[in-house]
């Protein structure tokens, strides 16, 4: 996953200043911990998949376990999804390699948990006795779809500064972050795994059951948006890196729709419900 320094720096700055980081970080500094740890966990997984030692994976796992059990749960799911998808596209159906790397990754991951168990174990016991773990909070709608107004705010909130913080769905990405979606094609398939990962996490974001699972099956919440934002930053890097592969017809359609929506957004005073 080596990238040119211009695209890498652009992705790093975008990830650091995405709106969710500013929104959540102001509310509580704990929300910044997973924002920092997740890219390092993915880098640690990448090293294990390439046959290197997983020291970085173990150390960052230990740090994230020390910091906050709640976010450690989300980080574990997101990191596992990254590892499975990356392996699938790196090694295909080589199951012998899968079990070898899986056991190797589990070793370094469990070693990291061992480093953090001094603090993690008491927190787990305290968390198990918390009132928040008493059961699933009822959801007014079906578990497989939000109300229509939520989707209106969510789609517009992808690129426009809309306070669509229902269930912590704070997005507001720069329009250039979607460049990577237009660079995929028959001649450029080495990053298809990123498109698959983006699709899976988008599905998790768009249905209440995904928010429930990512929040420990307690109630619907998408505080894991830091992981989704990391994928958006990677899409930006990929789009800049492969700008010559961008398919211009869908890109022009996207640009036209963006300017139309921007005009309507400004005309309606920034309200997606009008």
Residue map of PLM features:
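Membrane-interface helix-boundary motifs at transmembrane edges
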Residues: 1-4, 47-52, 90-100, 183-192, ...
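Periplasmic/ER-lumenal interhelical loops and adjacent helix-loop junctions
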Residues: 100-194, 200-222, 226, 266-273
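Membrane-embedded helix bundles of polyisoprenyl
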Residues: 1, 5-89, 104-124, 129, ...
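Juxtamembrane loop-helix boundary motifs flanking transmembrane segments in multi-pass membrane proteins
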Residues: 5, 9, 17, 54-55, ...
């Amino acid at each position: 996953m080596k990238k040119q320094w211009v695209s890498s720096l652009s992705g790093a700055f975008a990830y650091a200043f995405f709106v969710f980081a500013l929104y959540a970080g102001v509310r509580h500094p704990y929300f910044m911990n997973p924002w920092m740890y997740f890219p390092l966990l993915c880098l640690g997984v990448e090293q294990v998949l390439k046959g290197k030692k997983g020291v970085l994976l173990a150390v960052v796992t230990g740090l994230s376990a020390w910091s906050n059990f709640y976010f450690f749960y989300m980080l574990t799911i997101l990191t596992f999804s990254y590892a499975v998808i990356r392996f699938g596209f790196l090694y295909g159906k080589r199951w012998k390699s899968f079990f070898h790397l899986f056991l190797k990754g589990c070793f370094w991951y469990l070693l990291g948990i061992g480093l953090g168990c001094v603090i993690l174990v008491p927190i787990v016991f305290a968390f198990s006795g918390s009132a928040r773990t008493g059961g699933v909070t009822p959801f007014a709608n079906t578990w497989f779809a939000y109300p229509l107004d939520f989707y209106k705010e969510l789609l517009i909130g992808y690129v426009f500064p809309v306070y669509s913080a229902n269930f912590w769905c704070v997005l507001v990405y720069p329009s250039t972050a979607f460049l990577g979606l237009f660079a995929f094609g028959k001649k450029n398939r080495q990053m298809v795994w990123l498109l698959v990962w983006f699709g899976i996490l988008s599905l998790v974001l768009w249905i209440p059951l995904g928010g429930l699972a990512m929040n420990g099956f307690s109630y619907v919440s998408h505080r894991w948006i830091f992981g989704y934002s990391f994928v958006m930053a990677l899409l930006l890097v990929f789009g800049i890196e492969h700008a010559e592969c961008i398919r211009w017809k869908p890109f022009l359609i996207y640009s036209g729709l963006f300017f139309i929506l921007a005009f309507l957004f400004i005309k309606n005073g920034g309200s997606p419900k009008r």
